[in-house]
Amino acid sequence: MNGDQKLDVHNQEKQNFIQHFSQIVKVLTEDELGHPEKGDAITRIKEVLEYNTVGGKYNRGLTVVQTFQELVEPRKQDAESLQRALTVGWCVELLQAFFLVLDDIMDSSYTRRGQICWYQKPGIGLDAINDALLLEAAIYRLLKFYCREQPYYLNLLELFLQSSYQTEIGQTLDLITAPQGQVDLGRYTEKRYKSIVKYKTAFYSFYLPIAAAMYMAGIDGEKEHANALKILLEMGEFFQIQDDYLDLFGDPSVTGKVGTDIQDNKCSWLVVQCLLRATPQQRQILEENYGQKDPEKVARVKALYEELDLRSVFFKYEEDSYNRLKSLIEQCSAPLPPSIFLELANKIYKRRK
């Protein structure tokens, strides 16, 4: 298959995935929209779903479907099993939406996926916290509706619950490493950074979609899952470091969001790299300007990053990490096809959004 054909297949898969969303909304809302007691709340759920779940890249959700199709022999891929794979893909997207709505509140973000954050919309505010919980609840309603009779139902429930917990642990590490109003650069070590990334991003963004497809394909052995986890945690770190780079150096018209890591006092890959390279004078500049909302102070930190040429440091890291990832896939992917992991790595390598 040449590049254009691959693109056509990918675009078709993406369209099929997006089209399934209307079915998801229908299952979650249709029966109760006219309910005499709950009707108004169900209308709100529909609005929350339609604003917060669509508009992303759908990489996580599509990974479930693509991996399922690669692991399950074609004769077993009937319409019903593909519906279930699409639904579980949307459950991953719902989990992502749940985290993002809350994350945007905690980070005081303004835009997400090219539109104003949900909590920033007039009349929403902190009610968005409850809306996020509705998104999380939708996951388990869908799993029950579509997968309850399947042998992998319990494994999927545990996987989603575990992924939520790991992500919340990661968010906790992130928040306590950089408490609001307290800048303590001594906390920003490479070790702490890797822990935050492992728990906050890698589990739900990389392991969850692949592991869900594995369970749906009947692959539930500990060794197979441990090997997949090893590769996918490494990939998750690679992805988050790209994200940290794009937060500052990305183009908001491409990324769909304006980065706030410097003013939010985040333990970002860039600040960790800056601290590893800074002279005492440069560290002083960082101490005086990091974690503050003043645009001039943010600009000083950015200038310091430019002075230390952190762009080049990132490009070298991206190259080295990609090569390391490829050799890890070679060693650990069996008995799964290496292509599952390689396609995912290629999708994020040199991404700019």
Swiss-Prot record:
<feature type="binding site">
    <location>
        <position position="103"/>
    </location>
    <ligand>
        <name>Mg(2+) 2</name>
    </ligand>
</feature>
<dbReference type="GO" id="GO:0005737">
    <property type="term" value="C:cytoplasm"/>
</dbReference>
<keyword id="KW-0153">Cholesterol metabolism</keyword>
<dbReference type="InterPro" id="IPR000092">
    <property type="entry name" value="Polyprenyl_synt"/>
</dbReference>
<feature type="site" description="Important for determining product chain length">
    <location>
        <position position="99"/>
    </location>
</feature>
<keyword id="KW-0756">Sterol biosynthesis</keyword>
<keyword id="KW-0753">Steroid metabolism</keyword>
<dbReference type="GO" id="GO:0045542">
    <property type="term" value="P:positive regulation of cholesterol biosynthetic process"/>
</dbReference>
<keyword id="KW-0963">Cytoplasm</keyword>
<dbReference type="InterPro" id="IPR033749">
    <property type="entry name" value="Polyprenyl_synt_CS"/>
</dbReference>
<keyword id="KW-0444">Lipid biosynthesis</keyword>
<keyword id="KW-0808">Transferase</keyword>
<keyword id="KW-0152">Cholesterol biosynthesis</keyword>
<comment type="subunit">
    <text>Homodimer. Interacts with RSAD2.</text>
</comment>
<dbReference type="GO" id="GO:0004161">
    <property type="term" value="F:dimethylallyltranstransferase activity"/>
</dbReference>
<keyword id="KW-0007">Acetylation</keyword>
<keyword id="KW-1207">Sterol metabolism</keyword>
<feature type="binding site">
    <location>
        <position position="107"/>
    </location>
    <ligand>
        <name>Mg(2+) 2</name>
    </ligand>
</feature>
<feature type="modified residue" description="N6-(2-hydroxyisobutyryl)lysine; alternate">
    <location>
        <position position="57"/>
    </location>
</feature>
<feature type="binding site">
    <location>
        <position position="103"/>
    </location>
    <ligand>
        <name>Mg(2+) 1</name>
    </ligand>
</feature>
<dbReference type="Pfam" id="PF00348">
    <property type="entry name" value="polyprenyl_synt"/>
</dbReference>
<keyword id="KW-0460">Magnesium</keyword>
<keyword id="KW-0414">Isoprene biosynthesis</keyword>
<feature type="binding site">
    <location>
        <position position="60"/>
    </location>
    <ligand>
        <name>isopentenyl diphosphate</name>
    </ligand>
</feature>
<keyword id="KW-0443">Lipid metabolism</keyword>
<feature type="binding site">
    <location>
        <position position="266"/>
    </location>
    <ligand>
        <name>dimethylallyl diphosphate</name>
    </ligand>
</feature>
<dbReference type="GO" id="GO:0043434">
    <property type="term" value="P:response to peptide hormone"/>
</dbReference>
<feature type="modified residue" description="N6-acetyllysine; alternate">
    <location>
        <position position="57"/>
    </location>
</feature>
<protein>
    <recommendedName>
        <fullName>Farnesyl pyrophosphate synthase</fullName>
        <ecNumber>2.5.1.10</ecNumber>
        <ecNumber>2.5.1.1</ecNumber>
    </recommendedName>
</protein>
<feature type="binding site">
    <location>
        <position position="112"/>
    </location>
    <ligand>
        <name>dimethylallyl diphosphate</name>
    </ligand>
</feature>
<feature type="site" description="Important for determining product chain length">
    <location>
        <position position="98"/>
    </location>
</feature>
<comment type="pathway">
    <text>Isoprenoid biosynthesis; geranyl diphosphate biosynthesis; geranyl diphosphate from dimethylallyl diphosphate and isopentenyl diphosphate: step 1/1.</text>
</comment>
<keyword id="KW-0752">Steroid biosynthesis</keyword>
<dbReference type="GO" id="GO:0008584">
    <property type="term" value="P:male gonad development"/>
</dbReference>
<dbReference type="GO" id="GO:0009410">
    <property type="term" value="P:response to xenobiotic stimulus"/>
</dbReference>
<dbReference type="GO" id="GO:0004337">
    <property type="term" value="F:(2E,6E)-farnesyl diphosphate synthase activity"/>
</dbReference>
<feature type="binding site">
    <location>
        <position position="96"/>
    </location>
    <ligand>
        <name>isopentenyl diphosphate</name>
    </ligand>
</feature>
<dbReference type="GO" id="GO:0045337">
    <property type="term" value="P:farnesyl diphosphate biosynthetic process"/>
</dbReference>
<dbReference type="GO" id="GO:0046872">
    <property type="term" value="F:metal ion binding"/>
</dbReference>
<dbReference type="GO" id="GO:0005759">
    <property type="term" value="C:mitochondrial matrix"/>
</dbReference>
<feature type="binding site">
    <location>
        <position position="257"/>
    </location>
    <ligand>
        <name>dimethylallyl diphosphate</name>
    </ligand>
</feature>
<dbReference type="GO" id="GO:0005777">
    <property type="term" value="C:peroxisome"/>
</dbReference>
